[in-house]
């Protein structure tokens, strides 16, 4: 039975939940790293309109952007053992942590692919032509000139993706991950103070999100300053 609201319990719950913040951040970090790498590979066929692969990338991105993250969590959590079982490998006792990382990585890849594609599209085509004029190949021009500038343009959206993914990790408890939200569920069961637990959770998540926003805002300003210098030097070398 739910107990009467107690403001003091919020202060007690915050440090208890914060102790599990490293688990949440670990899931977030790994899924962002893997997601960004996969997203880059998904973005390339979209950017260069590679037949068949482009269509497959479109379907992948559409699926992961068009379905709820909780549904994706359950598909991966139950789907991996089902698939590995077909080849005689038993992963039914797999730590749900890995299923959560895999799910968020796959989901982040879809978002990252579109962000990278938009970033590349925002780079002045004259930069690529200038790169060709000094003897760079297509791949060299992309790696050295286009991609760095595209990532700078995409940086604000990347920041939004990180914060969105942070909030999405709050659902990892649904497959048994003991992160902040998972610990919150056990606190609700043991204390019968649901509202206080959710308020405490919101405080911790909000504090982390604000820190991330501040970091990306400061980093964006510094990166844009460096980009201006790099582009200026590149233009001077051409002329």
Swiss-Prot record:
One Gene Ontology biological process: amino acid transport
Induction comment: More strongly expressed in the presence of methionine than in the presence of sulfate.
Domain ABC transmembrane type-1: from-to ranges: 21-216
GO cellular component: ATP-binding cassette (ABC) transporter complex; plasma membrane
Annotated CDD domains: TM_PBP2
GO MF term set: transmembrane transporter activity
Keywords assigned: Amino-acid transport, Cell membrane, Membrane, Transmembrane, Transmembrane helix, Transport
Spans through the membrane: 25-45, 69-89, 96-116, 196-216
NCBIfam families: HEQRo_perm_3TM
Record's function text: Part of the ABC transporter complex TcyJKLMN involved in L-cystine import. Probably responsible for the translocation of the substrate across the membrane. Is also involved in cystathionine, djenkolate, and S-methylcysteine transport.
Protein name: L-cystine transport system permease protein TcyL
């Amino acid at each position: 039975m739910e107990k009467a609201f107690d403001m003091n319990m919020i202060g007690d719950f915050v440090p208890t939940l914060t102790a599990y913040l490293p688990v949440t951040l670990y899931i977030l970090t790994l899924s962002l790293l893997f997601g960004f790498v996969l997203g880059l590979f998904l973005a390339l066929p979209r950017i260069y309109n590679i037949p068949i692969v482009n269509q497959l990338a479109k379907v992948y991105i559409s699926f992961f952007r068009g379905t709820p993250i909780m549904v994706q969590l359950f598909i991966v959590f139950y789907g991996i053992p089902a698939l590995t079982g077909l080849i005689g490998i038993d992963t039914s006792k797999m730590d749900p942590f890995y299923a959560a990382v895999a799910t968020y990585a796959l989901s982040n890849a879809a978002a990252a692919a579109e962000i990278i594609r938009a970033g590349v599209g925002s780079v002045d085509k004259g930069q690529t032509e200038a790169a060709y004029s000094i003897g760079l190949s297509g791949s060299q021009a992309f790696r050295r000139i286009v991609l760095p500038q595209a990532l700078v343009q995409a940086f604000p959206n990347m920041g939004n993706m990180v914060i969105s993914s942070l909030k999405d990790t709050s659902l990892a408890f649904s497959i048994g991950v003991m992160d902040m939200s998972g610990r919150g569920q056990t606190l609700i069961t043991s204390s019968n103070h649901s509202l206080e637990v959710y308020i405490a959770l919101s405080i911790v998540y909000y504090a982390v999100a604000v820190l991330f926003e501040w970091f990306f805002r400061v980093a964006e300003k510094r990166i844009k300053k460096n980009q201006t210098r790099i582009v200026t030097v590149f233009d001077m070398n051409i002329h």
